[in-house]
């Protein structure tokens, strides 16, 4: 996004001790360890957190050739047990982390953000209105005096960016010099500037601060007026002056004085301004586009009372220092939700997330939003992220908000910008994938953003001008290679945990700044604990499902171990929560039974009919096969016994968990699939419906199948999954290719036409699922989407990539 910030904590807000720049402690104090070989699942009556204390931590072999060869066959003999200590109470550690995050989310106000020495220096330069010759805000000068770094500079102590250190330091030197205080600090700061100014030549241009080419020359001129001599003959400075002159020629002075633009954010660097006109463009809080330095400059020239109130409030709020932008409330609310979701821990915070998005929706406008509420200027980054999250959570938002950002065939983050931001276009791409039917603007946004990001990736130019983050190239690469239709929650989480930098991620504004409620180690450590806990349970389930497989000799019915693993992976990657184990195993076992039946009777219509007849003979009660002798050949008998024994177990599980007898519903669902399959021998016909119906039944969701919406969902899901199944079957022996997620299909190619139809149906399905006004339980509808996305993933994801995901998701612990 455009500007984001990082944080100073208020006294009544949660103390984020882990945000210490120099010595971050463990996020959850009191970790202790011991050896155990115990297996248990603990349940809490109010919030179920299942803690799988499994066998000692086990490691899998490194599958270095996983992308070139077939799926690694991971069996018990491949797994070496290691005596690795486990936390005494993982449940307590997770609960403690959840409580900390809940406290953070519950304390959100205008945004937590770090202090900017540059902006604080501008505030310190303001002369007292009633006592000329003295500072209006002496506490800002004191903040500067207290926060000089050991090398004589000011700026972020953990990240050395020459642009950041130089502009912060020069501004602070000017402020101290103006009021003739702390000459020793001035001298040390000036020495730092002179010794390091040449480093600008080697800096990455993508990481140049916002408006640096305007603000820094302005500071140099101020320094000269105060008698501060700085050599200006370096090639780096000459380049900056050239960029400044070019940018100033492009600034439409007539427009900027009459219409709110992003130039209001950098007024302190612009010459010859008509302040009488500009004051009319103030934000409602008295600021100029929420910039303390820009507003401080305006206060110097206008003595405006609203400017004074804005600055005065910030100085008191942050104890003398001020941020580089404030407030950042919408940015913080949106990005927090995004991080929690991608880290896989959002399920712990449903009420808080609902509150966050409700807040964002209250300030949503027909033109979008920016980083703060009540802004007359919007940006594509915050608008895209907000649009995506609001639509995902059932809010009605129009894609027309993106029209103002379209410029010809391109989309821009702001009108008048000089270069694109990777993350802005990346978030536009993510938003465009929430497309409903006939949303042309999103089609255009998707096509542009995909092409832009692919070109940047091919040129190894995935550096962003708004954030320095741990692994943006792989984050963007994953989104391009695995579009949202194919993106499985656990796969995204497993990879994002490695890409998320926690408190080390730093944002780029006029200075570097941090957003501790967006980027922190509390989220990261909680995500790691929760992921490994879930994975431990998944590993136990994997062991057990292999025993189920062996017990029924499913290998003899055409289901190999690799298929079993892929099927369990698909179920787990969608339904990963410990408390949803029954649904997860039901998904996996149902899919495996379907495969076994379809594979074994693939070439014999007579045997399919025989199987269907025998299936229907069983009474519609519990205990289908108890004591009954099957007068059919052994294979059919074995499969029928297997199916009904498994259905019996499903029914018992549902009865125990939900207190409902779903036996009849299960039988009806299976009978419908069996009869459909026996006609044409195509297992894909109706398979998705069987999975959806069974999963929802096991989750305690019952719904009238006669309802029009329910029938429409089933029809769409069956249609799309059947098409995807056939597409996968037809292309499984060809060289796989990633899905072209840009809408640019070749209409003369039958496969492209099939893809176009799939995309069209997917948009309609997404619209039905995300529409919250139809009265249907969202959890029921989400099952339709989850099953369909698993088919999409299978059809369009390279087998080598699938193998890699399986190894990461199920067998590689997060460290």
UniProtKB/Swiss-Prot annotation:
Source species of the chain: Tripterygium wilfordii
Any single Pfam family the record assigns to this protein: Terpene_synth_C
Signal peptide from the UniProt entry: none
One cellular component (GO) term of this entry: chloroplast
Cofactor: Mg(2+)
Documented activity regulation: Inhibited by high concentrations of magnesium.
Domain of life: Eukaryota
Stated name of the protein: (-)-kolavenyl diphosphate synthase TPS14, chloroplastic
GO molecular function, one term: isomerase activity
Function of the molecule: Diterpene synthase that catalyzes the formation of (-)-kolavenyl diphosphate from geranylgeranyl diphosphate (GGPP).
Transit peptide as UniProt keyword: yes
Record keyword Transmembrane present: no
Binding site for Mg(2+): 379, 381
């Amino acid at each position: 996004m455009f500007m984001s910030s990082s944080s100073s904590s208020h006294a009544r807000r949660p103390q984020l001790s882990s945000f210490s720049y120099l010595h971050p402690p463990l996020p959850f104090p009191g970790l202790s360890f011991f050896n155990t070989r115990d297996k248990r699942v603990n349940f809490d009556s109010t919030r179920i957190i299942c803690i799988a204390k499994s066998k000692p931590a086990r490691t899998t072999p490194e599958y270095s050739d996983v992308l070139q060869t077939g799926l690694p066959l991971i069996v018990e003999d491949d797994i070496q047990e290691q005596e690795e200590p486990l936390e005494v109470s993982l449940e307590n550690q997770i609960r403690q982390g959840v409580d900390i995050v809940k406290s953070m989310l519950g304390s959100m106000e205008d945004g937590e953000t770090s202090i900017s020495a540059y902006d604080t220096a501008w505030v310190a330069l303001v002369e007292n209105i009633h006592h000329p010759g003295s500072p209006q805000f002496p506490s800002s000068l004191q903040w500067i005096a207290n926060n000089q770094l050991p090398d004589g500079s000011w700026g972020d102590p953990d990240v050395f960016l020459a642009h950041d250190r130089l502009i912060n330091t020069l501004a602070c030197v000017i402020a101290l010099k103006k009021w003739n205080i702390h000459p020793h600090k001035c001298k040390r700061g000036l020495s730092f500037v002179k010794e390091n100014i040449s480093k600008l030549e080697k800096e990455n241009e993508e990481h140049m601060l916002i408006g640096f080419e305007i603000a820094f020359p302005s500071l140099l001129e101020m320094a000269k007026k105060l008698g501060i001599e700085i050599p200006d003959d370096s090639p780096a400075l000459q380049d900056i002056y050239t960029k400044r002159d070019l940018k100033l020629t492009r600034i439409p002075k007539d427009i900027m004085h009459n219409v709110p633009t992003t130039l209001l954010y950098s007024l302190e660097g612009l010459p010859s301004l008509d302040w009488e006109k500009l004051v009319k463009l103030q934000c409602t809080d008295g600021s100029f586009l929420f910039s303390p330095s820009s507003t401080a400059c305006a206060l110097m020239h206008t003595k405006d009372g609203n400017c004074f109130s804005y600055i005065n409030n910030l100085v008191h709020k942050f104890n003398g220092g001020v941020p580089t932008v404030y407030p950042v409330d919408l940015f913080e609310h949106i990005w927090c939700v995004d991080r929690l979701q991608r880290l896989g821990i959002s399920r712990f915070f449903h009420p808080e997330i609902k509150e966050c998005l409700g807040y964002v929706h209250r300030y949503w406008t027909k033109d979008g939003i920016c980083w703060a509420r009540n802004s007359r200027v919007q940006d594509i980054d915050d608008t895209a992220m907000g649009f995506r999250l609001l639509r995902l959570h059932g809010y009605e938002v129009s894609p027309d908000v993106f029209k103002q950002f379209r410029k010809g065939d391109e989309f821009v983050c702001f009108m008048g910008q000089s270069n694109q931001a990777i993350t802005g276009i990346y978030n536009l791409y993510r938003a465009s994938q929430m497309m409903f039917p006939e949303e042309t603007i999103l089609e255009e946004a998707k096509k542009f953003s995909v092409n832009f990001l692919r070109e940047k990736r091919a040129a190894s130019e995935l550096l962003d001008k708004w954030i320095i983050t741990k692994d943006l190239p792989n984050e963007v690469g994953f989104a391009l290679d695995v579009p949202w239709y194919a993106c499985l929650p656990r796969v995204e989480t497993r990879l994002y945990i490695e890409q998320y930098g926690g408190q080390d991620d730093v944002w780029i504004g006029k200075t570097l700044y941090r957003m501790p409620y967006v980027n922190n180690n509390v989220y990261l450590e909680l995500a790691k604990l929760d992921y490994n806990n879930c994975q431990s349970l998944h590993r136990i389930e994997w062991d057990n499902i292999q025993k189920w497989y062996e017990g029924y000799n499913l290998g003899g019915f055409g289901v190999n171990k690799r298929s079993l693993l892929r099927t369990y992976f698909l179920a787990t990657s969608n339904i990963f929560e410990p408390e949803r184990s029954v649904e997860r195993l039901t998904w996996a076992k149902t899919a495996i039974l379907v495969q076994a039946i379809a594979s074994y009777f693939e070439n014999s219509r007579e045997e399919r009919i025989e199987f269907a007849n025998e299936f229907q003979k069983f009474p519609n009660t519990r205990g289908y096969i108890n004591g009954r002798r099957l007068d059919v050949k052994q294979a059919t008998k074995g499969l029928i016994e297997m199916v009904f024994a498994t259905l019996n177990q499903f029914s018992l599980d549902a009865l125990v968990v939900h207190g409902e007898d779903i036996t009849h519903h299960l039988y009806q669902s299976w009978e419908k699939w069996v009869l459909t399959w026996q006609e044409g021998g195509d297992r894909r016909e109706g398979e998705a419906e069987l999975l959806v119906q069974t999963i929802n039944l096991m989750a305690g969701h019952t719904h009238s199948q006669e309802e029009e919406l329910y029938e429409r969902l089933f029809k769409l899901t069956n249609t799309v999954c059947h098409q995807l199944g056939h597409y996968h079957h037809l292309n499984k022996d060809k060289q796989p290719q990633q899905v072209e997620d840009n809408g640019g299909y070749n209409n003369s190619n039958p496969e492209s036409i099939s893809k176009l139809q799939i995309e069209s149906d997917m948009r309609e399905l997404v619209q039905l699922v995300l529409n919250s006004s139809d009265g249907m339980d969202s959890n029921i509808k989400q099952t339709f989407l989850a099953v369909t996305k698993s088919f999409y993933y299978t059809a369009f994801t390279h087998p080598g990539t699938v193998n890699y995901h399986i190894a990461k998701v199920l067998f590689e612990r997060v460290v």
